[in-house]
């Protein structure tokens, strides 16, 4: 399963996925 944010770079669009 490919995650939205699997790297240290976390764009605002990816926040819900990163911090969700």
Swiss-Prot record:
Keywords: Amidation, Cleavage on pair of basic residues, Disulfide bond, Hydroxylation, Neurotoxin, Secreted, Toxin. It comes from the Eukaryota. This is Conotoxin PnMLKM-D0211. Belongs to the conotoxin M superfamily. It comes from Conus pennaceus. The modification Tryptophan amide is found at residue 19. Expressed by the venom duct. Residues 1-3 form a propeptide. Disulfide bonds join 4-18, 5-14, 10-17. It is found in: Secreted. The keyword Transport does not apply. The modification 4-hydroxyproline is found at residue 16. GO terms for cellular component: extracellular region. GO terms for molecular function: toxin activity. The cysteine framework is III (CC-C-C-CC). Its main location: secreted. The keyword Iron does not apply.
């Amino acid at each position: 399963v490919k995650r939205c944010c699997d790297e240290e770079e976390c764009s605002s669009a990816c926040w819900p996925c990163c911090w969700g």
